[in-house]
Regions:
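Substrate-binding N-lobe of the ribokinase-like
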Residues: 1-48, 260-261
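Conserved beta-alpha-beta core of the PfkB/ribokinase-like small-molecule kinase fold
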Residues: 92-161
Length: 268
């Protein structure tokens, strides 16, 4: 949903796919329609989850209370996969976040297979280790963070060289592009042609929730708009930082100013 909102803010029409449940699901759908975003949700029993993020200013700690949400049946899963199979060659599909109850992470592999066969550009932003099993289907873009790299490769990842090494390992396994979000350290973009790094601008962090979504949505919009990789990475880092410096998603009012603090450089 956050990626859909960011894309729309930047002038990219898109359709929000997924499931909805109860009054919270209806609220989300109504909000998206209010923003003139097309929706294509499967309705299920229960209630769409509400997650709570709390920042304790005194000790600069953030607490995330993530609810389970509704449980999906096998019928719901198959209906969702059917929607994916109806995508057309050249479409872009962004799969982001955690899966509902009743859905095995192996669904990511099936989605990857369908997109590969349909020649759909697949973007994966999820922490499950099954992401590694999706790489043979050559997803267009992965957006991991440093914690996910550590979990996937069962190792400590601490330096920029480490990030680049494991990012390139993902490329070797089949991913086409990597957008690696590094929080206060900025971000890296990698493909088989180049490696770019960018620092984070300074500011008071209010809430890190959704900053990765803002970065990803901005990057996808920039890709569609034909921005250079350097300009796109800079704007994407600024949008993610702008979101971290406020209570909700960025409105892009301060993004241009934040961009002035960001330097993009090509890594060897």
């Amino acid at each position: 949903v956050n990626v859909s909102l960011i894309l729309k803010m930047l002038g990219i029409d898109n359709t929000a796919l997924g499931v909805k449940a109860g009054f919270t699901g209806n609220y989300v759908e109504d909000y998206l329609k209010e923003k003139e975003i097309t929706t294509d949700f499967i309705e299920v029993a229960g209630t769409t989850r509400i997650n709570v993020f709390t920042k304790v200013i005194q000790d600069q700690k953030e607490y995330k209370l993530v609810n389970k949400g509704p449980k999906l049946s096998e019928e719901h899963v198959q209906r969702f996969l059917k929607k994916i199979s109806e995508l057309r060659k050249g479409d872009y599909l962004c799969v982001s976040g955690s899966l509902p109850q009743g859905v095995s992470p192996s669904i990511l592999i099936e989605i990857s297979r369908i997109c590969f066969e349909k020649q759909v550009f697949l973007i994966l932003d999820s922490s499950y280790e099954e992401i590694l099993d999706c790489l043979s289907y050559q997803p267009f873009l992965l957006k991991p963070n440093e914690e996910e790299l550590q979990e996937w490769f069962h190792t400590e990842v601490q330096t920029k060289d480490d990030y680049i090494f494991y990012g390139q390992e993902l490329l070797k396994r089949g991913a086409k592009n990597i957008l690696l979000s590094l929080g206060s350290e900025g971000a890296l973009f990698m493909n088989n042609e180049k490696v770019l790094s960018g620092n984070s601008p300074t500011g008071m962090v209010v809430n890190t929730a959704c900053s990765g979504d803002a970065m990803l949505g901005t990057f996808l919009a920039g890709w569609h708009q034909g921005l250079s990789l350097e300009k796109n990475l800079k704007r994407s880092i600024a949008a993610g930082s702008s979101t971290a410096f406020r209570k909700g998603l960025t409105d892009f009012s301060d993004v241009q100013e934040l961009e002035q603090q960001i330097k993009i450089q090509e890594e060897e």
